[in-house]
């Protein structure tokens, strides 16, 4: 089954990462690539990523994935959300000298794959 996973990122968060010399888009792409390469329990059969840029440094990640079974969708989304939030928090903490940032608003929205 194919799905489009969309995660919107506010420009303020992008700026916060920029202040500490980090490119948030690149960090997200690297985390998603690592996540896909690990392929937790072999759930994801294929995937591709696109970034939709908006004004004021806001953007949305669009991840088109094919999973083995519909029943796995919630587990895939939860695992990816947790991975992004945790890894971004650690990266920010390391590069900011110990500061923390609020990442709980980074949620993935499930859409039907519009490429079908």
Curated annotation (Swiss-Prot):
InterPro entries: Mastadenovirus_E4/Orf3, Mastadenovirus_E4/Orf3_sf
UniProt keyword list: Early protein
Gene3D superfamilies: Mastadenovirus E4 ORF3
Superkingdom assignment: Viruses
Protein name per the record: Probable early E4 11 kDa protein
Record organism: Human adenovirus A serotype 12 (HAdV-12)
Lineage: Viruses, Varidnaviria, Bamfordvirae, Preplasmiviricota, Tectiliviricetes
């Amino acid at each position: 089954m194919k799905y489009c996973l969309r995660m919107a990122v506010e420009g303020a968060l992008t700026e916060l990462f920029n202040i500490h010399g980090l490119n948030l888009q690149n960090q997200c792409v690297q985390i998603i690539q690592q996540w896909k390469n690990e392929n937790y329990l072999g759930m994801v059969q294929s995937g591709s990523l696109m970034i939709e840029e908006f004004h004021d440094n806001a953007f949305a990640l669009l991840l088109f994935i094919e999973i083995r079974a519909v029943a796995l969708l919630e587990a895939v989304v939860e695992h990816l959300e947790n991975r992004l939030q945790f890894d971004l928090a650690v990266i920010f903490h390391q590069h900011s000298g110990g500061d923390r940032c609020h990442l709980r608003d980074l949620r993935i929205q499930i859409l039907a794959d519009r490429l079908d």
